[in-house]
């Protein structure tokens, strides 16, 4: 009943802050309960998915709230809803739900690890190539900046430590563009800086 929603949300919030033995199982239960309670007219799914990294971060499992299960849940959408619908009807549904959810967390974590390894491999490849091509002490700081800001304006380039003169920086950017390591998205014009 909608009149009982505040009571249920209060209980949900208490469980959110409770110390459970297994944080990921607690997360599985919290996520399902939030989706079942459906407290808002719109956005419950998005908010329910956003609560996953927030909860893991709050519990110290993540150093940043940056673990998103959305892609995995979308891939397994039919099974996801089937498990959620079964929670109120089948005695073993909570166990099946937790197994399903934990499988998703594991598979998404493995995919995130694979992508992180690919990004590191790309970084190391580019690092060696850029150092060899530019022979500049500023090549690695520029590469670090590019990885931190994959899309940037030419006027945004900055980092801690020694910074090159504008002509040196322009030469570095030109060398990276010519080698294909930096893609010009929007040419600069007048007062408008280029976007890479």
Task: Identify the role of each PLM range.
Residues 1-116:
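Phosphate/pyrophosphate-binding active-site loops
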Residues 12, 135-139, 192:
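Conserved, hydrophobic alpha-helical core segments of structured domains
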Residues 36, 148, 178-179:
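The C-terminal cap of the DNA-recognition helix in HTH/winged-HTH DNA-binding domains
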Residues 104-138:
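Conserved alpha/beta core segments of nucleic-acid transaction machinery
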Residues 139-143, 148-161:
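Short acidic, hydrophobic short linear motifs in intrinsically disordered regions
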Residues 163-178:
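Short amphipathic alpha-helical interaction segments
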Residues 177-188:
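A short, conserved structural fragment
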Residues 189-196:
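Minor-groove-contacting beta-hairpin "wing" of winged helix-turn-helix DNA-binding domains
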């Amino acid at each position: 009943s909608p009149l009982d929603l505040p009571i249920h949300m209060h209980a949900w919030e208490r469980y959110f802050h409770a110390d459970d033995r297994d944080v990921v199982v607690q997360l599985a239960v919290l996520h399902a309960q939030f989706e079942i309670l459906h407290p808002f007219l719109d956005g419950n799914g998005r908010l329910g998915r956003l609560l996953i990294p927030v909860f893991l971060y709050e519990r110290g499992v993540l150093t940043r709230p940056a673990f998103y299960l959305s892609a995995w849940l979308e891939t397994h959408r039919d099974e996801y809803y089937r498990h959620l619908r079964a929670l109120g009807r089948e005695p073993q549904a909570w166990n099946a739900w937790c197994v399903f959810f934990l499988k998703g967390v594991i598979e998404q974590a493995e995919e995130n690890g694979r992508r992180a390894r690919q990004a590191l491999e790309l970084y190391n490849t580019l690092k060696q190539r850029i150092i060899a091509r530019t022979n500049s002490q500023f090549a690695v700081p520029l590469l670090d900046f590019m990885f931190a800001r994959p899309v940037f304006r030419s006027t945004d380039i900055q980092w801690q430590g020694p910074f090159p003169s504008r002509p040196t920086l322009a030469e570095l950017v030109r060398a990276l563009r010519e080698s294909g390591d930096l893609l010009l998205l929007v040419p600069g014009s007048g007062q408008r800086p280029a976007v890479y």
